[in-house]
Amino acid sequence: GYDQEWFTDEWQRLSGCGPTSASQVLGYSLFRDGLLDLETTSDQTLALERMNLVWKYVKPRFGGGVYKTQWMERGLTRLLEDKGLSYDVHMLNVSPFCASRVEVEAAAQFIHDALAQDVPVAFLNRHKGKEKALYTWHWVPIHKMFMDGDDIRCGIFDEGEIRDFSLANWMKDTILGGGFCYISRKE
């Protein structure tokens, strides 16, 4: 996976989790669809060039980064349109208010729909709850979802590590919500 520590600018390294996750979703999708070759996809220098391009569209705001899923959705949509890439952006917001929060099953279905198309999901976690594998106020790509007994778990890439967290526990415990975003090829 890509790493926001690759950015050369201090502000980008500090607040670049959103553009980094968006770059991974985009880069993987382009590779899968034959629009990026393996050498280009796996080269860190070229990946950083894509991260800097994505930064111009999925731009962190001072005081909080890309802390709204709508900003990820709008930025990716603009980038795809500007570059003539035939993809749709899908977004699911998780409200900070329990009464208006989507059900765990709906979030799991959204993630499943993306992964079934062989595309990672950018995940915004504004508050980690009790999930030790997550950092608060952070975007990470989800690359898999699996069951562990009755628990729905999501595999993530972050800081060069592979970790997993409980989707149900996160949705129950988060006090600030978050959301999910992926792209799919237009038909």
Which residue stretches match the model-derived regions?
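Active-site-adjacent structural segments surrounding the nucleophilic cysteine of cysteine proteases
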Residues: 1-74
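Conserved active-site-adjacent core of cysteine acyl-enzyme catalytic domains
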Residues: 48-186
